[in-house]
Design a protein with these regions (language model features):
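N-terminal Rossmann-like FAD-binding beta1-loop-alpha1 element of flavoenzymes
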Residues: 1-24
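Short glycine/serine/threonine-rich phosphate/pyrophosphate-binding segments
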Residues: 9-12, 170, 186-187
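Generic hydrophobic/aromatic pocket-lining and core-packing "Φ" positions
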Residues: 12-13, 83, 190
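Short, glycine/charged-enriched secondary-structure capping and boundary segments
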Residues: 16, 37-40, 187, 191-194
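Conserved N-terminal/central alpha/beta ligand/cofactor-binding core
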Residues: 21, 26-157, 161-163
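Core beta-strand elements of the Rossmann-like FAD/NAD(P) dinucleotide-binding domain
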Residues: 165-176
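Glycine-rich loop(s) and the adjacent beta-strand/alpha-helix scaffold that form part
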Residues: 175-199
Length: 199
């Protein structure tokens, strides 16, 4: 069970679907998420002359001491593989002369910003991932708010959801519960079990 249908939730649903059945619960329609409104591009060290180490240095310097070095390290080391996943899922990144186009922006020392549809990157990623999720058999339940986990012996075993159209409560069971970006996270008393599929 995946809670949320933004880029993180849809991406996780496609990876998890490679290993079993998946249900995505989202409080609005699948195309009503913040991902759709994300403009600009995605930074990843995928170009010639670039590296995770250089990307790390640029990011730490631009962060002016506010960046968590371990989080930045994970981000830059994983970025190229995640971009390759998005390409595999069909995200139409802009190209130039047959290769992914890379722009030089902000505090980056080399071109490493990928765009899709110019500044409509978020919309293109969300549209592509939601289409792939549906065509790959990911079950999607829209207008379903998840206020509570179902816990058994200290482990999350499912969720209680409210169908926002009917007001009816529904329960869903699952071996793994993945939550990514939901506003009520801090109100949950029991931690969610993170699936190894999300790594």
């Amino acid at each position: 069970i995946i809670i949320g249908s933004g880029i993180a939730g849809l991406y996780a649903s496609l990876l998890a679907r490679e290993r079993g059945s998946v249900l995505v619960l989202t409080k609005a329609s699948i195309d009503e998420c913040n991902t759709r409104f994300a403009q600009g591009g995605i930074a990843a060290p995928v170009g010639r002359g670039d590296s995770p180490q250089l990307h790390f240095q640029d990011t730490i310097q631009a962060g002016a001491g506010l960046s968590d070095p371990e989080a930045v390290r994970v981000l830059v080391e994983e970025a190229a593989d995640r971009i390759n996943d998005l390409i595999r899922f069909g995200v139409p990144f802009d190209t130039q002369e047959g290769e992914v186009a890379l722009a030089l922006e902000a505090a980056h020392s080399v071109p490493r910003i990928l765009h899709a549809g110019g500044d409509a990157t978020g919309e293109h990623i969300e549209t592509t991932l939601s289409r792939q999720a549906r065509s790959n058999g990911v079950a999607i339940k829209e207008h379903s708010l998840v206020p509570r986990l179902l816990v058994e012996r200290g482990r999350a075993r499912g969720v209680r959801a409210v169908d926002l159209a009917s007001g009816r409560e529904e329960e869903y069971q699952g071996r793994f519960i993945i939550r990514k970006a939901i506003p009520t996270v801090d109100s949950w008393e029991v931690p969610v079990i993170q699936s190894p599929l999300s790594n």
